Amino acid sequence: MRVVVLGSGVVGVASAYYLARAGHEVTVIDREAGPALETSFANAGQISPGYAAPWAAPGVPLKAVKWMFEKHAPLAIRLDGTRFQLQWMWQMLRNCTADRYAVNKGRMVRLAEYSRDCLQALRADTGIQYEGRTGGTLQLFRTQQQLDGAAKDIAVLQEANVPFELLSPAELKNAEPALAAVSHKLTGGLRLPGDETGDCQLFTTRLAALAESLGVKFRYNTPIDSLAIAGGRIAGVQCGSETVRADAYVVALGSYSTSFISNLMKIPVYPLKGYSITAPIVNDAAAPVSTVLDETYKIAITRFDQRIRVGGMAEIVGFDKNLRAARRETLEMCVNDLFPGGGDTSKATFWTGLRPMTPDGTPIVGRTPVSNLFLNTGHGTLGWTMSCGSGQLLADLISGKKPAIQADDLSVHRYLKDVAGQTRPAYA
């Protein structure tokens, strides 16, 4: 089968790779000059299935109000003048209940755990290298309230059989030796030893090369204008004056997926702006060995070979990609507070990206009401974590195979109108 994949971020490239492995003739189209040059370029670098969780959580609405007045707040909201933004925020608020959080986190962990398994199999099969580490993830708590609040996450981890360790301040140094110097600032930590880290952009570039070796064609610097419709099916992709035709089409355009298919269906994928800095390591003993999550600031600090990546925060501000100096200040403050002297933040590069987020946190992967159109988008802050599993899942669906995990609750159908014409709730 001929398949066109739109988008060459980590999700699009993973989709292409697994489709090619399944025997399909695949073409990837992207407006950029190469793979992973937008949202996948400088993300936090963590592959954290156990920490796969929706931003829509109990207590978040009240926290959001408090964060409005804090200098280093992890969340910021600025109205962009669109009705879509208001609708999306309302849908997100409706998911901020304990019941919805448990459902959403459960299916996110399911896909993320499967994706980690797919990544491990890929690594064993191909030997792909991307400055990856398998040292786990450590979530740090600065208050007793944060530590107590981890109970709901631990319950989900236990239900999903995800191994974890609850550490006291004195035990944190066993996972991250450099934290011994700052343990007095912390009340404890939750460690997931099965989590991994790695450079997403490097991984995507090398996976694209592997995909090319399987026959995948990459068409970069190519405009993606619209989908041509005929007889209720996709008849082609309009790329400037050219129409590219295939048997099936995959939209993996991140935050831009929403507007691209708006004439066919309405999907609630909104750009959640995040930031990162990447600093050279100057003192190995003072640097992290894997990934640390600061629960207070919602910031991830990740170790690559000779670099530290610090990323996080969320701004609901539309498609604004301006770099705000205050956000860099927050990232530098966080890493220097936990790992003083580990990296030289004065020499750090500064980046921002738009994560494609759904109101319930769960991505949209699978079939659509248009028989030959498939979606692989809406992964939010977990595109790197979920990429391989989403790609394999999509390849199975297109190939007519039964997926290895439950997939019906990941599709776009949870957002579309039912047979009675009623819109299904965004928390379905």
Curated annotation (Swiss-Prot):
SUPFAM superfamilies for the chain: FAD-linked reductases, C-terminal domain (SSF54373), FAD/NAD(P)-binding domain (SSF51905)
GO BP: D-alanine catabolic process
Enzyme Commission code: 1.4.99.-
Pathway in which the depicted protein is active: Amino-acid degradation; D-alanine degradation; NH(3) and pyruvate from D-alanine: step 1/1
The organism's place on the tree of life at top rank: Bacteria
Gene3D superfamilies linked to this entry: D-Amino Acid Oxidase, subunit A, domain 2, FAD/NAD(P)-binding domain
Any one of the GO CC terms: plasma membrane
One Gene Ontology molecular-function label: D-amino-acid dehydrogenase activity
Cofactor needs: FAD
Residues that hold FAD according to the record: 3-17
The protein's enzyme class: oxidoreductase
Pfam families in the record: DAO
Alphabetically ordered keywords of this record: FAD, Flavoprotein, Oxidoreductase
Job description of the protein: Oxidative deamination of D-amino acids.
UniProt cross-references to HAMAP family, sorted A to Z: DadA
Protein name (Swiss-Prot/TrEMBL): D-amino acid dehydrogenase
Annotated source species: Burkholderia ambifaria (strain ATCC BAA-244 / DSM 16087 / CCUG 44356 / LMG 19182 / AMMD) (Burkholderia cepacia (strain AMMD))
